A protein has these predicted regions:
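A structured, mid-to-C-terminal "fold-capping" secondary-structure block
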Residues: 89-132
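A structural signal for short, hydrophobic/glycine-enriched beta-strand patches
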Residues: 1-95
Length: 132
């Protein structure tokens, strides 16, 4: 999905334009996580909202969480899957339902490389987050 397609929904939800940052320099999710968490720490932000398609959201979350944990940051991550995306039509990146299998493969691959937080770390983080 394109940022230009999502932005009106974000603004209609009440998020001010000044609070929206479109990161478009990274080549992959890991680079987005490293850059995003670095930017958050530099600017003393306490919260990051991750907007991604449903099928990519879980891996994106685990990737950003890995970076938050590695930096020993107290940043709170929020998931916000993009809405109203069809599962069976080509969105420009392919058919989402067909891409789902690749996400599972990538989760396994990047977990083995240490790019993702573990399931246990995600659960512990979620417990901590709910106490904040």
């Amino acid at each position: 999905f394109l940022f230009s397609d999502i932005l009106p929904h974000v603004l209609n939800a009440g998020v001010p334009t000044s609070a929206v940052i479109h990161e478009d320099r990274s080549l992959n999710t890991k680079e987005q996580a490293v850059g995003g968490v670095r930017m958050a720490i530099k600017n003393s932000w306490k919260r990051l909202v991750l907007v991604a398609s449903h099928e990519h959201q879980y891996r994106a979350y685990l990737t950003f969480l890995r970076e938050v944990l590695d930096k020993k940051s107290d940043i709170i991550l929020y998931n916000s899957p993009a809405e109203n995306l069809g599962w069976f039509s080509d969105s420009g990146w392919g058919v989402r339902f067909e891409r789902l299998e690749q996400e599972f493969i990538r989760i396994q691959k990047y977990s083995q490389l240490g790019h993702l937080a573990t399931y246990g770390e995600a659960i512990d983080y979620q417990k901590w987050k709910e106490l904040q």
